């Protein structure tokens, strides 16, 4: 499987890539399949079953909303977040849902979407969609797996996405060691290798434009989260806990006191925290975000990239592009050899992976060698090993928002530590990726995005 930078960084909506974006894409694929095969007009009803982690935390993660939007023909990267609540309320009031926006079927959420804690054999995040005719006969039944980061595969089918391109990649790699060997043999940086690989799928202009669009969405997300031209940011987050959004107040405090940087050399940490919190509060509110590589960890790469552009002398547009390409190369290693799904390996696969990606990318744009970049990425994951995914109330809020801030600061520290060395280190990135996957396999299910362990059972829902 060959993976593009645009597979790792996808524009979508919150609060979850695996539980909102993935199911939305699956439902859209299902509805489009009905239309493609001439079954849409004969469809009299649809039924959706959510399994495993989707069933356990799907309500808090917006899985039901994502599925409904997908059935209605919406895609994560184009749906208008500001219209979602109104449109779903219209479905509730009319008790009808328009498949692909054109074909009405009866739809009552509690009757047509079912939640099951029992997981499917293939993956903890499974969903089954069925379409029936007027006589109740099954027209189509499809089972999908949301495997993390918005990636969706059909259960029982090989993942054939871009397999034909593997041998065509000018710089094919599956491990950190192979990546370093390519850098050594070609004399190119990791970003340069990724840039040349992207030409298999995109022109150079398409790649540059696409990456800058990703960066633009990240910047817009931070701005909205800070309350810039977004009065809603001063309120509370959805859900029973009424968590107060903190980013706007923090933004006003920091921007209103610029001389603080002269008195407190660590004031930049406050800004890094702000950037991460702003993104993840927007994510928790269902706003527009970039999976990086997941929604639950969407604040780390934007926060560290904002740190680079704001605080690093000589930062420029090319540096932003190199940052994203380097981060994607590291993310690909986790995607190919481990997991980026909290339901499969815990939060080490989300915040841990994002921290590793950001650390390596920052080291690269700070002038690090490929060996130092690999070292930074390894440090970023090594000290997230064993991190559990225990969202309180099934919401992507506590501890997720603060955890992104902590992961962002940790990524900056990992990059700086690596740059103080020569790239020689005992634990390789490949070893830590393997260890992360093994640790995730050993982790009890209650600590893997089921809200049945950890903080999720020790915080009383009020």
Predicted regions and their residues:
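Accessory "access/gating" subregions that flank catalytic or transport cores
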Residues: 202-346, 454-462
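Conserved phosphate/anionic-ligand binding catalytic regions in large, soluble enzymes, centered on
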Residues: 9-27, 284-304, 347-355
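Extended hydrophobic packing segments that form well-structured cores
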Residues: 426-462
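Hydrophobic alpha-helical bundle architecture
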Residues: 315, 326, 332-405, 417-426
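Short, mixed-charge aromatic SLiMs
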Residues: 45-58, 90-98, 324-337, 378-391, ...
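C-terminal regulatory domains involved in ligand/effector binding and gene-expression control
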Residues: 76-260
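Alpha-helical support elements that line or immediately flank enzyme active sites
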Residues: 18-35, 302-314, 359-367
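N-terminal signal-anchor module of multipass membrane proteins
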Residues: 2-13, 29-30, 45
